[in-house]
From Swiss-Prot:
Belongs to the universal ribosomal protein uL2 family. GO terms for molecular function: rRNA binding; structural constituent of ribosome. This is Large ribosomal subunit protein uL2. GO terms for cellular component: cytosolic large ribosomal subunit. The gene is rpl2. HAMAP family: Ribosomal_uL2_A. GO terms for biological process: cytoplasmic translation. It comes from Methanococcoides burtonii (strain DSM 6242 / NBRC 107633 / OCM 468 / ACE-M). Residues 202-237 are annotated as: Disordered.
């Protein structure tokens, strides 16, 4: 009898396919600050978070609260940081986009005012403020796309720490396995034609070939719905 294929097993939600979110340290957001005020704090620690590729910093603010933030390059323990309209334009400080000069690298940009930050948060990435108008600010994203934001959306000055991560090779399959395991990603990924006949519709045979058409109906049952799903055409154009 055939076994469940990986996509079916993943849908069941066993621990193998569930992210270990109980190990994740914190949800990184900008601190809540009134529009006209500024909040100061001190970096008291820099830590690794299994949930992300960049290091995170614990900041103790003057209002008595402690919070993890996205840490830019050049920030160290004991550094003084500020968040608000009157904060100095320097790496680590958080300001509204309306107060940031053009050409400055920024990270952890809010999608809408006070949502905590949504864009440019991965290690080594940054966006650049291109131009400013009365009702919108234009930012060049890490992908090169130009995106419009509300002037009251906040961003952190600087480039996210941990740059060069993708340039360093894993060297061992075991290290890649543990990296993918922290994200609940299945690794290594075996192609269907390399599997046994009980594991995949394309498995089995004396050589690597699907053995049947790779196009499949949109209404095919889950164990058969692999390959080119409801494809209008296949092959090179």
């Amino acid at each position: 009898m055939a076994k469940r294929i990986i996509s079916q097993n993943r849908g069941r939600g066993s621990p193998t396919y569930r992210a270990p979110s109980h190990k994740y340290k914190a949800e990184l957001k900008h601190p809540r600050v009134d529009e006209e005020s500024t909040l100061n704090g001190t970096v008291i620690g820099i830590e690794h978070d299994p949930a992300r590729s960049a290091p995170i910093a614990m900041v103790a603010f003057e209002n008595g609260k402690k919070q993890f933030i996205v840490v830019p390059e050049g920030i160290s323990v004991g550094e003084k940081l500020s968040c608000g309209v009157s904060a100095e334009v320097k790496p680590g400080n958080t300001l509204p986009l309306a107060e940031i000069p053009e050409g400055i690298p920024i990270c952890n940009i809010e999608s809408k005012p006070n949502d905590g930050g949504q864009y440019a948060r991965s290690s080594g990435v940054y966006a650049t403020l291109v131009s400013r108008e009365l009702s919108k600010v234009v930012v060049r994203m890490p992908s090169g796309v130009l995106k419009w934001f509300h002037p009251k959306c906040r961003a952190t000055i600087g480039i996210v720490a941990g740059g060069g991560r993708v340039d360093r090779p894993f060297l061992k399959a075991g290290k890649k396995y543990h990296k993918m395991k922290a994200r609940a990603a299945k690794y290594p990924r075996v192609s269907g034609i390399a599997m046994n006949v009980v594991d995949h519709p394309f498995g089995g045979g004396n050589r690597k070939h699907p053995g049947k058409p790779t196009t499949v109906s949109r209404n095919a049952p889950p164990g058969r719905k692999v390959g080119h799903i409801a494809a209008r055409r296949t092959g090179k154009r």
